[in-house]
UniProtKB/Swiss-Prot annotation:
Residues binding Fe cation, per UniProt: 228, 230, 289
Compartments where located: Cytoplasm; Nucleus
EC top class named in words: oxidoreductase
Protein residues bound to 2-oxoglutarate: 298
Name by which UniProt lists this protein: Egl nine homolog 1
EC number: 1.14.11.29
Cofactor annotation remark: Binds 1 Fe(2+) ion per subunit.
Keyword line: Cytoplasm, Dioxygenase, Iron, Metal-binding, Nucleus, Oxidoreductase, Phosphoprotein, S-nitrosylation, Vitamin C
Protein's organism: Rattus norvegicus (Rat)
Role description: Cellular oxygen sensor that catalyzes, under normoxic conditions, the post-translational formation of 4-hydroxyproline in hypoxia-inducible factor (HIF) alpha proteins. Hydroxylates a specific proline found in each of the oxygen-dependent degradation (ODD) domains (N-terminal, NODD, and C-terminal, CODD) of HIF1A. Also hydroxylates HIF2A. Has a preference for the CODD site for both HIF1A and HIF1B. Hydroxylated HIFs are then targeted for proteasomal degradation via the von Hippel-Lindau ubiquitination complex.
């Protein structure tokens, strides 16, 4: 029996002029055995964390409105490479049928995700849960869509006549315990396990909570989400985690690529929204990104993880208001994060 070939991975495009040997941003590790968009900034009703919390800080007047990408050279997916921060093949031997064992969560976290994030700020894991589980998640998401649970994605600060000029997705927020969302809950628990194993090793962050899962659908009518930053104003979110559900996705035909523009680099990373692919990246201004127009139905599930210290500061800022005067809140007026 043969091990499965290493999957494709996103690579940072070389700067204009084609400098040889440009570094890859992220890579792809195989997780199972067989890139969304960040969206509306979550408010307190969307959080899963001990205690109660504020919504994000309102973008300031200095913040430029979302803008379209300047159009540097297009990045492409390439065969997996080696080394920390690059693609990591699964280990642990082969199953009798030749399938590769899933990489244990602890090993995946410490030997791949941590070095990849700390080096590049972007990390891709392919075949995260396996085909069967990924299919079950997709079935649950499509059922939510078919029963009218999705609403138009909203913006925190309205700087356009229509939010659809900026983002064209439809979303719903899921805790993971709702009837019919059990496998989505399993996905969220699996994400939590990875982050727990990374605890204390992702930059200087002390991660202690997350949002609910934002399930997003681009309906395939050519809409996307213009270039933006998830957390431009210190609302507490430090890591964006996106899971994709799109089988047999062909970006050349259907578009829908998530393009990330790492801060201070004349390079970008293109992440195709492939089935059972998990993506991590820093949520702050280091990673402006956009969802390019999608011409087929495109599903993704996004969770944001909180840094404890920044989240606490954001709560104080929210409760004291603009002038530093504490705002009195009625009982239960701020939703708990659990």
């Amino acid at each position: 029996p043969r091990a499965q070939p290493a999957p494709a991975q996103p690579r940072v495009a070389p700067p204009p002029g084609g400098a040889p040997g440009a570094a890859r941003a992220g890579g792809a590790a195989r997780r199972g055995d067989s890139s969304t968009a960040a969206s509306r900034v979550p408010g307190p009703e969307d959080a899963t964390q001990a205690g109660s919390g504020p919504g994000p800080a309102e973008p300031s007047s200095e913040d430029p409105p979302p803008s379209r990408s300047p159009g540097p050279e297009r990045a492409s997916l390439c065969p997996a490479g080696g080394g920390p921060g690059e693609a990591l093949s699964p280990s642990g031997g082969l199953r009798p049928n030749g399938q590769t064992k899933p990489l244990p969560a602890l090993k995946l976290a410490l030997e791949y995700i941590v070095p990849c994030m700390n080096k590049h700020g972007i990390c891709v894991v392919d075949d995260f849960l396996g085909r069967e589980t990924g299919q079950q998640i997709g079935d649950e998401v499509r059922a939510l869509h078919d029963t009218g649970k999705f609403t138009d994605g909203q913006l925190v600060s309205q700087k356009s006549d229509s939010s659809k000029d900026i983002r064209g997705d439809k979303i719903t927020w899921i805790e993971g315990k709702e009837p019919g969302c059990e496998t989505i809950g399993l996905l969220m628990s699996s994400m939590d396990d990875l982050i727990r194993h990374c605890s204390g090793k992702l930059g200087n962050y002390r991660i202690n909570g997350r949002t609910k899962a934002m399930v997003a659908c681009y309906p395939g009518n050519g809409t996307g989400y213009v270039r933006h930053v998830d957390n431009p104003n210190g609302d507490g979110r430090c890591v964006t985690c996106i899971y994709y559900l799109n089988k047999d996705w062909d970006a050349k035909v259907s578009g829908g690529i998530l393009r990330i523009f790492p801060e201070g680099k004349a390079q970008f990373a293109d992440i195709e929204p492939k089935f059972d692919r998990l993506l991590f990246f820093w949520s702050d201004r280091r990673n402006p990104h956009e969802v390019q127009p999608a011409y087929a139905t495109r599903y993704a599930i996004t969770v944001w993880y909180f840094d404890a210290d920044e989240r606490a500061r954001a709560k104080v800022k929210y409760l004291t208001g603009e002038k530093g005067v504490r705002v009195e809140l009625k009982p239960n007026s701020v939703s708990k994060d659990v």
